[in-house]
Amino acid sequence: MKNNYTSLKSPLDEEDELKTDHEIDLEKGLLPEYNSEEEGTLPLYSDISKLANPVPEDSSTGPTEIANPNVERRQEFKDSHPNIYFLLRLLISVLAVSVVFFTAWVCVNPLEKSIFGKVAFSVTIGITCPILFIATFCFFETWTQAVAQCIKVTVIFLAQCVKVTVIFLAQCVKVTAVFLAKCVKVIAVGLYNSKKDLVVTIWLAWVVICFILFGCVKDGRLNLNKALICSTCSISAALFFILLLVCIPIWTLKHMLFGLFQVLGVQSCVVIVTKGLMYLFDKHIDATGYEIEASSLFVIGNFLFFYEMERPGALKRMPKFIGNGIASFLGGLGNAFGGIGNAIGRIGNAFRGANDNNDIPLGEMDVESEV
């Protein structure tokens, strides 16, 4: 019987099998060249993978840890200079033991006569110092690494604390500055809207302060020169400046400063005139002179302040006003003296006419009477 077996594979499946026979495994790389003569020398894929990855991998330990450069430098120094490294360990250990010994000696020395002091000193010398020396010398690398790590962590922590503190303080300063600016703005607007009440309140406070200072001067508890400066120039100038700054809009700052300097100039002139008069008439300056000077400055300061507040720009117009007043006064004096002169001339003419009438003869008087 003939075998009528027919393959169930389609032509497409056969083509796929032919293709897969010649495909390359990308993970294992290219296949090595096959030599038919030396068929037994064909390397395996495992050998090829070992050649491609020469670094051995230990699945139990995982990837190798990165070495610490400080540890490597220390190991190199230890290998290259063993004697110096040994002396360094010994020196540091001796220094640590010496510090503990002298600390114990200073602390226990006052208690040397007592049993507790002797026992503590003996324990420190006999047990603590040897243990500390052995631990420091034998475990030098361990505790130095721990100390270095602790110092590093501490420095990083302190740096972070300083950074956070600086940022926090900057934020606090910013918030405080903004808050104060808003408060000043609100207060300034409120004071400007109620400047009449503010003027009266501060003027009353000013009067009370000046009277208190005058009372201290009179009572002898305050120096006259200090009282004069505090009660007149400083207080009047400061209050005048503050009140003008608050009560007058900011665009009149030039006018405010000009008025302030005018007030100070007037007060300086009063001081100079008062000093000159006191020097001319009384060389021995006593408390009465200071009281007169302080009272004059106080009255002038109040007058100029209220005059400026009621009529802004009055101080600027004051020189012209004073000049016009002086001119009017002198013109009035001139007119007065002219009127007095005219009156005197008329009186003289009247007397002259009376004298002329007395010189007429009697005959002429009879003729005139007949006519």
Swiss-Prot record:
Question: What keywords tag this UniProt record?
Answer: Membrane, Transmembrane, Transmembrane helix, Vacuole
This protein's GO CC annotations: cytoplasm; vacuolar membrane
Q: Where in the cell is it found?
A: Spore membrane; Vacuole membrane
Which InterPro entries does the UniProt record give?
Answer: WTF
- Superkingdom per UniProt: Eukaryota
List membrane-spanning regions: 86-106, 120-140, 153-173, 197-217, 233-253, 257-277, 287-307, 321-341
Q: How does it sit in the membrane?
A: Multi-pass membrane protein
Q: What is its main location?
A: membrane
Q: Quaternary state and partners of this protein?
A: Homomer. Interacts with other proteins that exhibit high sequence similarity.
As for what it does, the entry says: Acts as a suppressor component of the dual wtf meiotic drive system, and can suppress but not confer meiotic drive by compatible poisons. Wtf meiotic drive systems promote unequal transmission of alleles from the parental zygote to progeny spores by encoding a poison and an antidote from the same locus; the poison is trans-acting and forms toxic aggregates in all spores within an ascus, wherease the antidote is spore-specific and targets aggregates for degradation by the vacuole.
Say which family it is in: Belongs to the WTF family.
Name this polypeptide is given: Meiotic drive suppressor wtf18
Q: Which organism is it from?
A: Schizosaccharomyces kambucha
The organism that produces this protein has a lineage beginning with: Eukaryota, Fungi, Dikarya, Ascomycota, Taphrinomycotina
Q: Which gene encodes it?
A: wtf18
